[in-house]
Amino acid sequence: KWVNTKAIPSDHLLEGIGHVTDRERGVTVAVYGCVVKEVKLRPSVLAEIQKTAGISGTHPAMTSEGYSMTDPYASDEDKIYLEDNSSRIRLVVKDGSSVDLNRLCQGLVLAFKGTRGRGCFEVDDMAFPLPLAPKMIARSDSSDAKYVGFVSGLCLGQESEARSMLAEWITGAAVHKTDTVADPSTMVRLVVAGDTLAGVTTQADLNSVDKFLAQVARSVPVTILPGSQDPANFALPQQPLHSALFPESRKVKDLTAETNPARFQVGDCVFLGSTGACAKEVTQYSTSTDVLDALELTARSRVIAPTAPDTIACYPFPNFDPLVITEDEPVAHVMFSSTHNKAAFRVVDLGDAKLTLLSVSTFVFDPVLLLVNINDPSDIKRINFKASDTFQAEGEDGDTPMDDTS
């Protein structure tokens, strides 16, 4: 990207910058490494102890009555560093540069162009890893459209009229006024992405979950992912929900349990995604507070959970990192994140290819089914299952934003 710019290897980052003499201080160089953020508003155990003991302090969790521990922690007062295997150096934005360092979160491996300052590196530009281009999908006639549906947060331990309407629409048990673009016969798979068993407290509740999944899986293949409120291991990657939870559903061959994060393929279309924690943590620790912005940031940086293991527990793999997106696995056409407040989607241009991003809503709060065409992933439909006698079918002209940005 930066022609005629001296590159300093990350394993000699501070050594290389330290060897720049005062005469060479204004020379532009490129460095790369791992981004580390010193977040001033980050929750602190000591701050909680001080608050409980009534000791005065400066942390907003103690001094601001309106402060919520779910509010974003990122602020303009955060300090951002670039780290190698020996030490770190602070990054500051060079005067006149439009680079926004605050939208970054810790854990991203990026390159920066700039000059050496006094005790810092003055950034003029930054670059993400080169994007991976997914395999081209042969375009077919629009009449051959086949869709994969996405829902999350069904919370089958709670009553929900919208969920019953969803099951009726999938199975064809009831006739409703739907748009032809939302024909249930065009859906070839349903992805239930996390928090399916939220609110389940009794055996009767579990039996209802099993019955619901079996009913749906007899009409369309179902892929189910574990979430933070499901009975699965705490650290990423979460293992598939155990088949013993679903004695009736497991008899249906078309019910598949996946890990979280999950990568799977339907037709020629590859899907990669996780339940909400990965994207939510990015929104907490950067100024990218929109879920789709956070998801795009992780896609461009080629890492699913950049804040792990700092803010998200993850299993320490010694030889490889399953949370890093590499060319060793099929490259995704669609990336999704689930259990969010609202459903949204976006198509981003990565140069040689386009990537579809999905924010899947928690169904009990925002009862929306997102449909992605496996023959054209930029073709996204949504159906809003509100508690009424009709379903609202919305296509690309619906109220969900779809940006085509780079």
Q: Which residues are covered by each model-predicted region?
A:
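Extended recognition/assembly regions associated with phosphoester-bond processing machinery
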Residues: K1-S406
